[in-house]
Structure formats: structure tokens, C-alpha cells
């Protein structure tokens, strides 16, 4: 099911056990190199969340949520994207689907997922396809619920001694999603195609949280009774209080997309995409803290409105069957305004406006000769970000300009039994407005979060070597990160709180990664095993104390598919992650056992699938960070264990097409 193509890992879905998975998320879990994060989302090992393309167009979350897995041919995991991709993109998942059939089609899918609480989802897709016209519509409703347990503890070293602050959080989360999508695609001729797409999202959600907080002031005798950060009230100095909060949010968004695809000649083609999106959200968070007969109430509220305009053009010119160039550009404008309010001391009210414009251009050349193929590209991006604080009490305006060039290249050698690829890419990660604004955010009476307007962009340089031999695939990667942005905890002398968290740029970090994958087909059994290890070199001079964060992380997984008679299929997977050192944080090991079973009837029109994740409840993410002033630890337990039943019914088993690209997705994700 897996092979190398140039510098990409290709996963074959059609006519494999993956084609019987009920949803795209179930497929992505089995792609080598993908891993689950603390909140249950998926990311590429060492590269973060991938940007997903559907038939060369940037996909939206709504499109992916109702994508019919059986129509997927293959999925490419590109760890060194070319120059046409945004400079903030770490990895790309490129999903290729089959061509559409003509006729009326439909699909209904429901699932129920049981953990400590239930999540359910219902969706309906209908469409009509002719030789030249495709019209499809989608509606989905999700009632998403999950519980969170998040204990935290901080040992704070201040001038007058050591303080201990702790919180034991229990949260209940609920969100109701109503998502709609309409697509119209018109093939004007063999050379020209146009289309329009509209997406709408209505989200209402909330989080209720109960906390037991505790604190201990410095021991008057100067003795360190809690040097290992373990709770103990033997000395009678530990004090406790309770806190409750309710956070409710509302989001409304609309997104329109227009496209034109043209083939001007045998050697010249173009693609044009235009987008408009509007996003409006608001939330409120009342917090009540009780200690004995004393009670403190805090109310936090915020709202924002954003408009996004964007356009993109891509041109491909063939010089011959073996040589071509791609070039193009994009432009986007994001305008928004918002307001944050808090009744807590030091915070008050902040009104602001954001104005963000981006212009980019790229050029890439592809060629091949015999067993060799290569590509080289250059991308230029200019970004202007303007933040205006409208509050008269504390004006904090700023304007940032970014001008950067991003080179990339790749070279591949194909031999009868071997496949070699060497590639290089540069990327950037620019600080967000929330990190730059200078605002102060309330966490608890002992902790605030402060933004940092002096943050600089993070620049990353990656050199990757990939190889395939028969059933084995391997990868070596060197990564250098300049000015990485991380949290830091400090003890300010000029503010009446005991510690604050903020963002800061750090010096050079280096990572060395090695990866190996093996897969084979034994009749009805398809096993696949992979392992990877990453060693990090990183140290910080923290107020005169040189702290080393060097260390290794490694993980391994073993997937098994069993194809049985009468269209039954079983799967069993195991994964282990040692946690290790990631940035300044050290994680404890986690492991996961999962299984699945599905059965189809009526030539695939009816499918029932069952899956179980984290069978032994071992997906607990324990973290520890040591700094000069603060030792911080927490456990993130998102209750990832679950049992899920999915039922899918299809009418005529056809799928409508929409070939437009969403040029505004990057800006939407930032929101």
C-alpha cells in the first residue's frame, strides 16, 4: 500500500483495506509518519499539522468531513513541498480521487462515538452530474462532547522564597456544528471550466470547568519541603480554594470560492481562484473563585469580526515531455476588529483593529533525464501586518513588514530496486496578533499570560534524504530552527502576581531524524511497521543558568489488516511514543491499542463499521518544563479512549466534482 514517488510517500487507497475505512480520519491514522496529538488531532511527525489538498485544490474542513473514502485513489504525503506552496506549510497531504460518473447520487452517514460522554454526527450529500455540469449539496450536524482532566503545578522561585501553585481542572466541553456546502461546476468546453462554491458554518459551544486550586507561600524556616513538586500539606501551610468557570462561544462564517481552469494550448494551462470569507465570533467566561468565606468573581468577554479577500493564479508551461516550469502568484487581504473585556485588575478593556495584506510569487522548474529527475524553485512573500489598539488608556499600535525569499529543490534517482531522493526547503512561522498585541490574559489569580510585541518570525531549514528498497522505506532529515517561539514563565517584580507566562524567541535549535518503514502482503494479512527517532540539540541561557534541553524522542507502530471472506475486514494497531524532549518540555511515554471491524452489503451501498481507540486508556500526555524561575508540570487527559459505530448508506455510489481551489484557507486557519 505504500511506496516512494520522488520525495513523497504515496499511500494507495483504492482496492486496499484502507478503502473500507468509514471516514478520512480513519484512513489518515494508518499513514506512516502521522501521529495523534494530545487533543486527538493528527499531525506529521516533526512537521506539525499538514495542509491538505484535494485533487490539487486546497481543501476545507467541510469537504474533508464528508469525503467518500471509496473514491480516493491515493494519498501523497509530501514532506518537502515545492515553491508553489505557502512558506508556512511544513507538510502537504495531497488526496487524489477518481473521476466522476454521470447521474444522480447521494450518501447518508451517521456515527455515534462513546467515551465518558457521547458524540454523534449526521450528514447528507446529494448531487447531480451530467457530461458538462455538476451540482452537489451537503449538510452535516455534529454534537461533539468530551471531558478533560488537566492537573497543573508550578514551583516558583521568587526573591523571598519558593511558592507552590497548583490547579486540578475538570472540564466538560460541548459544541454543536451545523455545516453546509453547495458546489456548481460547469465544463464550458474541453479547454475551459468554471465553478462556484459556498460554505457556511454555525457553531455554538461551551465549556464548564471546576477547579480545586492550592498554593503555599515560602516556608518561613527556609526549608524546601516540596523540592520534587509533590503536594504535601504536612506542614499545615497549604491553602486551598475552589473555582468554577463557564465559557460559551458562538461562531458564524461564510466562504465563497470562484475558479476558472483553462488549457490555452498543448503546452500552456492556467488556474485562477478568487475567495471571500467572513467570520464572526464571540465568547464569554464568568469565573468564580472561593476561599473560605471570601469570593472573587471575574468576567472575561471577547468578540471579533473578520473579512478575507484573496486571489491566486497558477500557470504551467511545458517545453517538452520532460521539461516544464510552473509560476504564479497570490494576494490576500484580511481586515478585522475585535474587543476583549475583563473585570480583573490590570486587564480592563481592549478594542483593536487588524489589517493584514500578503503578496507572493513563485517560479519552479521540473526536468528529467534517464533515471534522474529534479526540481528547483524560489518563492517570494511580502506581508504587512498592522495592529491598532483603539483603547485610549493603553495605546499599543504596531506595524510589521516581512520580506523573505524561500528557495527549495529536490533530486531523485530511480533504479530497478532502489529509489533515492534528496530535497531541501525553507519555511517560516510568523507570530500571530495574539502573541504580539501586548494584551494581558487572565488565567487565575496567580497567573497571567502576557503577549510579546518584540517577537520575530521563526525560520526553518530542512534537508531530507529518502530511500526505498523493496518493502522498506527510510528517511534521514536534518532541521535547523532559528528564533523558535516558545512559552517562558517568569516572576515579574512590578506586577501583583506570582508568575506570568509569555512568548519568547530562542536561538538555534537543531534536530536529527531517522525513519524506517516496512510493509508486506501475506495473502489476507497486511502488516506494516514503522519506527522513527529524533534527537534535539538545544540549550538556553536563562538568567545566567545554562539549561540543556538536549534529548531524543522515538516512536514505533505496528498496523495489521485482515481481509476475511464475505466482505468482512478486521484491523489491529499498536503504537508507542517515549515522549522525550520536545523544545523545552519533556513528555512521558504514551501507548495506544486500537482495533476496527467493518462489513459491507448490497455491493458496497451499505456499510457498518466499528472501531475502538486507546483500549487501555494509556493516552495521557504528561509534561514537565524546567526553567530558572519556574518548574512547571501538567497532565493533559482528553479522554481519547472511545468506541465508535458508523453506518453509511449510498445512492447510486457517485460523487460530484468541484475543481476550485480555496485560496483563503491559510487565513481562515489563522482565525
What are these regions (language model features)?
Residues 353-356, 397-402, 428-482, 500-512, ...:
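Outer-membrane beta-barrel signature, preferentially recognizing the C-terminal barrel domain
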Residues 1, 24-27, 43, 62, ...:
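N-terminal periplasmic accessory domains that precede
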Residues 308-312, 358-360, 450-452, 456, ...:
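Outer membrane beta-barrel strand-and-loop segments of large Gram-negative receptors
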Residues 110-116, 130, 141-145, 200-204, ...:
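Transmembrane beta-strands of outer-membrane beta-barrel pores
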Amino acid at each position: 500500500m505504500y511506496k516512494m514517488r520522488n520525495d513523497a510517500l504515496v499511500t494507495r487507497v483504492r482496492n486496499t483495506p484502507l478503502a473500507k475505512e468509514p471516514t478520512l480520519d480513519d484512513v489518515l491514522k494508518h499513514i506512516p509518519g502521522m501521529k495523534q496529538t494530545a487533543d486527538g488531532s493528527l499531525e506529521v511527525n516533526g512537521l506539525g499539522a499538514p495542509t491538505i489538498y484535494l485533487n490539487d485544490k486546497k481543501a476545507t474542513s467541510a469537504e474533508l468531513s464528508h469525503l467518500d473514502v471509496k473514491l480516493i485513489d491515493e494519498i501523497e504525503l509530501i514532506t518537502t513541498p515545492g515553491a508553489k506552496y505557502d512558506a508556512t506549510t511544513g507538510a502537504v497531504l495531497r488526496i487524489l480521487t477518481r473521476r466522476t460518473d454521470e447521474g444522480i447520487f447521494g450518501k447518508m452517514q451517521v456515527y455515534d462515538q462513546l467515551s465518558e460522554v457521547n458524540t454523534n454526527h449526521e450528514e447528507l450529500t446529494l448531487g447531480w452530474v451530467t457530461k458538462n455540469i455538476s451540482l452537489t449539496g451537503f449538510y452535516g450536524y455534529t454534537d461533539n462532547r468530551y471531558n478533560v482532566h488537566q492537573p497543573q503545578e508550578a514551583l516558583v522561585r521568587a526573591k523571598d522564597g519558593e511558592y507552590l501553585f497548583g490547579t486540578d481542572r475538570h472540564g466538560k466541553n460541548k459544541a454543536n456544528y451545523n455545516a453546509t456546502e453547495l458546489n456548481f461546476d460547469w465544463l464550458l468546453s474541453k479547454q475551459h471550466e468554471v465553478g462556484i462554491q459556498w460554505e457556511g458554518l454555525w457553531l455554538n459551544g461551551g465549556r464548564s470547568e471546576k477547579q480545586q486550586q492550592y498554593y503555599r507561600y515560602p516556608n518561613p524556616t527556609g526549608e524546601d519541603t516540596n523540592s520534587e513538586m509533590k503536594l504535601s500539606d504536612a506542614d499545615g501551610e497549604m491553602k486551598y480554594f475552589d473555582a468554577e468557570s463557564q465559557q460559551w462561544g458562538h461562531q458564524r462564517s461564510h466562504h465563497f470560492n470562484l475558479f476558472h481552469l483553462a488549457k490555452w494550448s498543448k503546452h500552456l494551462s492556467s488556474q485562477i481562484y478568487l475567495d471571500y470569507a467572513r467570520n464572526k465570533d464571540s465568547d464569554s467566561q464568568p469565573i468564580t473563585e472561593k476561599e473560605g468565606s471570601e469570593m472573587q468573581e471575574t468576567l472575561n468577554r471577547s468578540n471579533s469580526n473578520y473579512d478575507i479577500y484573496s486571489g491566486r493564479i497558477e500557470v504551467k508551461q511545458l517545453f517538452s515531455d520532460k521539461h516544464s516550469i510552473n509560476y504564479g502568484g497570490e494576494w490576500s487581504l484580511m481586515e478585522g476588529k475585535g474587543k476583549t473585556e475583563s473585570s480583573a485588575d490590570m486587564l480592563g478593556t481592549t478594542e483593536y483593529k487588524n489589517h493584514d495584506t500578503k503578496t507572493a510569487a513563485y517560479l519552479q522548474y521540473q526536468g528529467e533525464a534517464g533515471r534522474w529527475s529534479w526540481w528547483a524553485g524560489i518563492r517570494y512573500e511580502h506581508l504587512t501586518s498592522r495592529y491598532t489598539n483603539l483603547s485610549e488608556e493603553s495605546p499599543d499600535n504596531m506595524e510589521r513588514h516581512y520580506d523573505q525569499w524561500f528557495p527549495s529543490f529536490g533530486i531523485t534517482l530511480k533504479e530497478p530496486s532502489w529509489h533515492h531522493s534528496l530535497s531541501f526547503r525553507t519555511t517560516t512561522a510568523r507570530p500571530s496578533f495574539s502573541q504580539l498585541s501586548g494584551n494581558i490574559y487572565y488565567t487565575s489569580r496567580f497567573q497571567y499570560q502576557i503577549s510579546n510585541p518584540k517577537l520575530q518570525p521563526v525560520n526553518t531549514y530542512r534537508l531530507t534524504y529518502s530511500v526505498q528498497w523493496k518493502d522498506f522505506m527510510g528517511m534521514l532529515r536534518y532541521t535547523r530552527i532559528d528564533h523558535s517561539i516558545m512559552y517562558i514563565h517568569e516572576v515579574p517584580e512590578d506586577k501583583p502576581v506570582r508568575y506570568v507566562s509569555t512568548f519568547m524567541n530562542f536561538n538555534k535549535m537543531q534536530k536529527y531524524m531517522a525513519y524506517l518503514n516496512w510493509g508486506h502482503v501475506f495473502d489476507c494479512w497486511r502488516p506494516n511497521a514503522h519506527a522513527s527517532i529524533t534527537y534535539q540539540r538545544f540549550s538556553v541561557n536563562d538568567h545566567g543558568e545554562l539549561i540543556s534541553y538536549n534529548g531524543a524522542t522515538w516512536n514505533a507502530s505496528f498496523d495489521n489488516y485482515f481481509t476475511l471472506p464475505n466482505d468482512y475486514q478486521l484491523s489491529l494497531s499498536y503504537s508507542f511514543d517515549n515522549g522525550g524532549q520536545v523544545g523545552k518540555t519533556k513528555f512521558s511515554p504514551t501507548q495506544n491499542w486500537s482495533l476496527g471491524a467493518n462489513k459491507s452489503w448490497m455491493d458496497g451501498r451499505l456499510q457498518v463499521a466499528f472501531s475502538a481507540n486507546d483500549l487501555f486508556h494509556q493516552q495521557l500526555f504528561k509534561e514537565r518544563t524546567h526553567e530558572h524561575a519556574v518548574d512547571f508540570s501538567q497532565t493533559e487527559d482528553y479522554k481519547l479512549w472511545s468506541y465508535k459505530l458508523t453506518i453509511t448508506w449510498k445512492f447510486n455510489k457517485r460523487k460530484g466534482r468541484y475543481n476550485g481551489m480555496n485560496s483563503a484557507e491559510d487565513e481562515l486557519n489563522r482565525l
